[in-house]
Amino acid sequence: AGEFVYDRPFLWGSRRTGPDLHREGGKRGDAWHFKHMYNPRLTSEKSIMPRYPWLVANELDLSKTKDKINLMKNVFGVPYSPAQVDSLDAWVKNQSVGIANRIVSEDSDIKKQIETQKAEKGKDFIPLENREVVALIAYLQRLGTDIKTAEVKTASN
Protein backbone atom coordinates (compact mmCIF):
# COMPACT_ATOMS: atom_id res chain seq x y z
CA ALA A 1 0.00 0.00 0.00
CA GLY A 2 1.32 3.40 -0.95
CA GLU A 3 0.90 5.00 2.45
CA PHE A 4 3.75 2.85 3.79
CA VAL A 5 6.28 3.90 1.16
CA TYR A 6 8.34 5.79 3.77
CA ASP A 7 8.12 3.26 6.62
CA ARG A 8 11.58 2.05 7.66
CA PRO A 9 12.01 -0.81 8.15
CA PHE A 10 9.19 -2.09 6.01
CA LEU A 11 6.55 -3.01 8.56
CA TRP A 12 4.20 -5.48 6.95
CA GLY A 13 5.31 -9.08 6.50
CA SER A 14 3.21 -11.86 5.06
CA ARG A 15 2.50 -13.70 8.32
CA ARG A 16 -0.58 -12.53 10.21
CA THR A 17 -1.09 -13.32 13.89
CA GLY A 18 -3.47 -10.46 14.60
CA PRO A 19 -5.58 -7.87 12.89
CA ASP A 20 -4.28 -5.88 9.96
CA LEU A 21 -3.53 -2.34 11.06
CA HIS A 22 -3.00 -0.86 7.62
CA ARG A 23 -6.35 0.99 7.73
CA GLU A 24 -6.67 1.52 11.50
CA GLY A 25 -6.47 5.32 11.44
CA GLY A 26 -9.67 7.01 12.59
CA LYS A 27 -11.62 3.79 13.18
CA ARG A 28 -11.51 4.02 16.98
CA GLY A 29 -11.11 6.83 19.48
CA ASP A 30 -7.86 7.69 21.22
CA ALA A 31 -9.18 6.45 24.59
CA TRP A 32 -9.94 3.06 23.02
CA HIS A 33 -6.30 2.74 21.89
CA PHE A 34 -5.08 3.89 25.32
CA LYS A 35 -7.10 1.19 27.08
CA HIS A 36 -6.21 -1.41 24.44
CA MET A 37 -2.48 -0.86 24.96
CA TYR A 38 -2.85 -0.93 28.74
CA ASN A 39 -4.95 -4.10 28.76
CA PRO A 40 -6.41 -5.41 25.48
CA ARG A 41 -9.11 -7.36 27.31
CA LEU A 42 -10.68 -4.05 28.39
CA THR A 43 -11.67 -3.41 24.77
CA SER A 44 -11.58 -6.86 23.16
CA GLU A 45 -12.64 -9.58 25.59
CA LYS A 46 -10.99 -12.53 23.82
CA SER A 47 -7.86 -10.73 22.65
CA ILE A 48 -4.61 -12.68 22.80
CA MET A 49 -2.55 -9.51 22.52
CA PRO A 50 -0.23 -8.96 25.49
CA ARG A 51 -0.55 -5.94 27.77
CA TYR A 52 1.76 -2.94 27.29
CA PRO A 53 1.33 -1.04 30.59
CA TRP A 54 4.79 0.55 30.39
CA LEU A 55 3.71 2.48 27.29
CA VAL A 56 1.07 4.15 29.45
CA ALA A 57 3.57 4.90 32.23
CA ASN A 58 6.85 5.74 30.44
CA GLU A 59 7.91 9.20 29.37
CA LEU A 60 8.59 9.59 25.65
CA ASP A 61 12.16 10.51 24.73
CA LEU A 62 12.03 13.10 21.95
CA SER A 63 15.72 14.05 22.12
CA LYS A 64 16.57 12.43 18.77
CA THR A 65 13.35 13.12 16.89
CA LYS A 66 14.71 15.96 14.78
CA ASP A 67 17.76 13.83 13.85
CA LYS A 68 15.44 10.98 12.83
CA ILE A 69 13.32 13.31 10.69
CA ASN A 70 16.42 14.67 8.97
CA LEU A 71 17.66 11.11 8.34
CA MET A 72 14.32 10.13 6.80
CA LYS A 73 14.39 13.26 4.64
CA ASN A 74 18.02 13.14 3.53
CA VAL A 75 18.63 9.39 3.23
CA PHE A 76 15.24 7.92 2.39
CA GLY A 77 13.70 10.82 0.48
CA VAL A 78 10.71 11.45 2.74
CA PRO A 79 9.41 14.80 1.46
CA TYR A 80 9.56 16.87 4.66
CA SER A 81 9.76 20.58 3.92
CA PRO A 82 12.25 22.83 5.75
CA ALA A 83 9.26 24.46 7.47
CA GLN A 84 8.06 21.08 8.75
CA VAL A 85 11.49 20.25 10.15
CA ASP A 86 11.85 23.71 11.72
CA SER A 87 8.43 23.56 13.39
CA LEU A 88 8.77 19.95 14.55
CA ASP A 89 8.77 20.66 18.29
CA ALA A 90 5.61 22.77 18.13
CA TRP A 91 3.92 20.25 15.83
CA VAL A 92 4.71 17.32 18.16
CA LYS A 93 3.52 19.27 21.22
CA ASN A 94 0.29 20.34 19.51
CA GLN A 95 -0.46 16.80 18.34
CA SER A 96 0.33 15.17 21.70
CA VAL A 97 -1.75 17.68 23.69
CA GLY A 98 -4.67 17.10 21.31
CA ILE A 99 -4.47 13.32 21.74
CA ALA A 100 -4.16 13.60 25.53
CA ASN A 101 -7.18 15.92 25.66
CA ARG A 102 -9.24 13.52 23.54
CA ILE A 103 -8.29 10.54 25.73
CA VAL A 104 -9.55 12.18 28.92
CA SER A 105 -12.63 13.67 27.25
CA GLU A 106 -13.62 10.30 25.72
CA ASP A 107 -13.27 8.29 28.94
CA SER A 108 -14.06 9.65 32.41
CA ASP A 109 -12.39 6.66 34.13
CA ILE A 110 -9.08 7.43 32.44
CA LYS A 111 -9.49 11.10 33.38
CA LYS A 112 -9.98 10.15 37.05
CA GLN A 113 -6.99 7.80 36.92
CA ILE A 114 -4.74 10.53 35.48
CA GLU A 115 -5.96 13.06 38.08
CA THR A 116 -5.27 10.55 40.87
CA GLN A 117 -1.76 9.87 39.53
CA LYS A 118 -1.07 13.60 39.37
CA ALA A 119 -2.13 14.08 43.00
CA GLU A 120 -0.15 11.05 44.22
CA LYS A 121 3.07 11.58 42.26
CA GLY A 122 3.37 15.36 42.57
CA LYS A 123 6.52 16.59 40.84
CA ASP A 124 7.27 13.07 39.54
CA PHE A 125 4.01 12.98 37.58
CA ILE A 126 4.45 12.57 33.82
CA PRO A 127 1.76 14.50 31.94
CA LEU A 128 -0.27 12.29 29.64
CA GLU A 129 0.87 14.17 26.53
CA ASN A 130 4.48 13.25 27.34
CA ARG A 131 3.96 9.48 27.52
CA GLU A 132 5.01 6.84 25.00
CA VAL A 133 1.43 5.62 24.46
CA VAL A 134 0.44 9.00 23.00
CA ALA A 135 3.11 8.71 20.29
CA LEU A 136 1.92 5.21 19.44
CA ILE A 137 -1.69 6.41 19.26
CA ALA A 138 -0.61 9.23 16.93
CA TYR A 139 1.00 6.64 14.65
CA LEU A 140 -1.97 4.26 14.76
CA GLN A 141 -4.40 7.06 13.98
CA ARG A 142 -2.45 7.89 10.80
CA LEU A 143 -2.40 4.37 9.38
CA GLY A 144 -4.32 4.27 6.14
CA THR A 145 -5.19 7.96 6.14
CA ASP A 146 -2.49 9.35 3.84
CA ILE A 147 -3.67 7.99 0.54
CA LYS A 148 -6.39 10.14 -0.97
CA THR A 149 -8.39 8.82 -3.87
CA ALA A 150 -9.88 10.96 -6.57
CA GLU A 151 -13.16 10.10 -8.19
CA VAL A 152 -12.57 8.89 -11.72
CA LYS A 153 -15.03 10.07 -14.34
CA THR A 154 -16.60 7.11 -16.09
CA ALA A 155 -19.48 6.63 -18.50
CA SER A 156 -21.78 5.65 -15.62
CA ASN A 157 -21.21 8.80 -13.57
Where are these regions (language model features)?
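Periplasmic c-type cytochrome electron-transfer domains
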Residues: A1-N157
